[in-house]
Amino acid sequence: MQQKVLSALEFHKVKEQVIGHAASSLGKEMLLELKPSASIDEIKKQLDEVDEASDIIRLRGQAPFGGLVDIRGALRRAEIGSVLSPSEFTEISGLLYAVKQMKHFITQMAEDGVDIPLIHQHAEQLITLSDLERDINSCIDDHGEVLDHASETLRGIRTQLRTLESRVRDRLESMLRSSSASKMLSDTIVTIRNDRFVIPVKQEYRSSYGGIVHDTSSSGATLFIEPQAIVDMNNSLQQAKVKEKQEIERILRVLTEKTAEYTEELFLDLQVLQTLDFIFAKARYAKAVKATKPIMNDTGFIRLKKARHPLLPPDQVVANDIELGRDFSTIVITGPNTGGKTVTLKTLGLLTLMAQSGLHIPADEGSEAAVFEHVFADIGDEQSIEQSLSTFSSHMVNIVGILEQVNENSLVLFDELGAGTDPQEGAALAMSILDDVHRTNARVLATTHYPELKAYGYNREGVMNASVEFDIETLSPTYKLLIGVPGRSNAFEISKRLGLPDHIIGQAKSEMTAEHNEVDTMIASLEQSKKRAEEELSETESIRKEAEKLHKELQQQIIELNSKKDKMLEEAEQQAAEKVKAAMKEAEDIIHELRTIKEEHKSFKDHELINAKKRLEGAMPAFEKSKKPEKPKTQKRDFKPGDEVKVLTFGQKGTLLEKTGGNEWNVQIGILKMKVKEKDLEFIKSAPEPKKEKMITAVKGKDYHVSLELDLRGERYENALSRVEKYLDDAVLAGYPRVSIIHGKGTGALRKGVQDLLKNHRSVKSSRFGEAGEGGSGVTVVELK
């Protein structure tokens, strides 16, 4: 892309605006190199990156760029062995923190389901160096000072320094407090000169003080003297400071060597963060100018919806629809000067450059932009009627260069084509130049104020006339582009509104040819028709958007209602499960009481059995149905005791015990017995053989209540198998469909013994080892008949 074209379209000013949104000097540096690309794949990727960054800004506000500084100089110095300063290590630590924060921030958003694959891909390249960050932070604080605990040696030296400084100050302050010394001192303070502690002594008392003069006041009236009594103490202090400096140098050298080991990773982190800053700056700019992602193509088709020039004040800029490259490849905008033609031309050119640079463009959603190999522009300040030959020549030199390079993958912009010479010759040249460029199938937008070009679009296939609307009422252009309507001067209307007498205007019109007047009338009619059509289209579009908004609101309400319904069902099911669990616990407690009574050889009394039965029946909760029960799938039939049924209100299987009269049955569900209405029962299968004694045994005979698991670990072989026999019988009586036997892995002897017993047991339907989550081969899961 030619630099003079970028300058003519003021692309550098757009770059300056984008640079203002960068978070670091690194991002600004990268944006300074921003330029249009001719690779559609690269452009689409950059636009998608900006789109993802815009989503992040919309959802989270900003990405964390704090700590991102340019440390490349420090890293290069570390590579060659130069010792880095504490402040440089503070910057490196800040960068390491920024890397950690950015990686976590973007990774968390991706894990939360935000669709940012390209940004996430950048973040995955970041390398967190926690060890290096910890080493630096343990030695240097946020202000670039080496900490006392950076080493034990440094801690000891600084303790010594503080002690020595305290002694020197105490000695000097005692001198200052001396009554004999007060008249000889300019001030009663201890100060420092040449890194040594001194006191201010008046010039006339110099001989009364032994010691070393380190400085004199500007007036010469005060001498800053180090008394002889503290010279040795100051010397000791200086020696300690030298040791401190040497130890700090050693610590910094060690840190530099550690940093040098990771310069490759740090350079990569810098590059990734620089790229992210580059992307997010473009996204922040897009938000500031209300830009959208254009749809890119390589077919030369442009359709900009409500396009706005990004450098004009938002409250003054006029949005325009611009379409080029499908039904016509050339647009010629005609009309008078100062009508806004150049702004329209620059808007098209600048938005094309922005899109090809991976920037979102100030236009409405759904706008399309094309990728061009070349963008040519001949734009100058041609707003004066008087044009010099030199101006015409310079434009013609530029046009000749364009004609030599233009091809079908070019966008060509001509501003006031043919201006600067005789109007008739200029118009003829303009048409000839347009014909030549049009034959290459390039995309062309040209502006001119020559009336001869009004008919150009009607006589050429693939060429469309256009103009910029002029408001007769306000005597000013509206800057609204009218494609399909050629421009007209409006000179008569303007003159009339400004007070020119009617007879002069009438005489002027008579001087015009009938053909010219007819053309002007036709153009005026076209303008009115187009305006009405646009108003109707705008109204239709408004109705469509309102309908879409209503549709989305209804969809959202449906989603919310479904979500609320699902939540209510889930809560109801959870409450039901909790009630069943509580009922099971109550039943277990009751059976445990009966078992205890039996083991203590107590005889059952009638009232104890009656109370236990009532408690068992009352243990089953009365559910508040949060949803309608299932309807029976089969036709109504005659139930009989022993039938296996499904209790629809609870979704559980059970066995019919006896009919209690009317339409109710006593149903056994596991260890629970309850009354259920016949309409809430669904037949599954008939009873194989009635076992009348089963319920009696369950309460009065066999002690059948057991846990769902039998733990045999630590048991002797024979005792363990005996327990398995008893446990299986009890589990069958308890109505359990499935139990687990924990035998452990060990030598495998107990496991094999259990497996052999289960194969031949009358109540075992099947058995298997537990899954990974059930205990693996250390557990056998038994299905009971």
From Swiss-Prot:
Species annotation: Bacillus subtilis (strain 168)
Any one annotated GO CC term: cytoplasm
Protein name from the UniProt record: Putative endonuclease MutS2
Annotated knockout phenotype: Not essential, it can be deleted. No change in spontaneous mutation rate; does not genetically interact with mutS or mutL. About 10-fold increased sensitivity to mitomycin C (MMC). Decreased transformation efficiency of both chromosomal (5-fold decrease) and plasmid DNA; a double mutS2-recU deletion strain has a 57-fold decrease in chromosomal DNA transformation efficicency. Hypersensitive to antibiotics that target the ribosome; erythromycin, chloramphencicol and tetracycline, but not to beta-lactam antibiotics.
Taxonomic superkingdom: Bacteria
Keyword ATP-binding among UniProt keywords: yes
Region of interest called Partially complements a deletion for mitomycin C (MMC) resistance and for chromosomal DNA transformation, as start-end residue ranges on this chain: 636-785
Gene name of the record: mutSB
Entry coiled-coil feature ranges: 513-586
Subunit comment: Binds to ribosomes as a homodimer. Binds to stalled/collided disomes, association is greater in (ribosome-targeted) antibiotic-treated cells (with increased stalling at specific mRNA sites). The clamp domain of one monomer binds the A-site finger, the 23S rRNA of the central protuberance and ribosomal protein uL5 of the leading (stalled) ribosome, while the other monomer binds in a gap between the ribosomal central protuberance and the L1 stalk of the leading ribosome.
Family: Belongs to the DNA mismatch repair MutS family. MutS2 subfamily.
Impact upon substituting residue 743 to A: Dramatically decreased binding to stalled/collided disomes
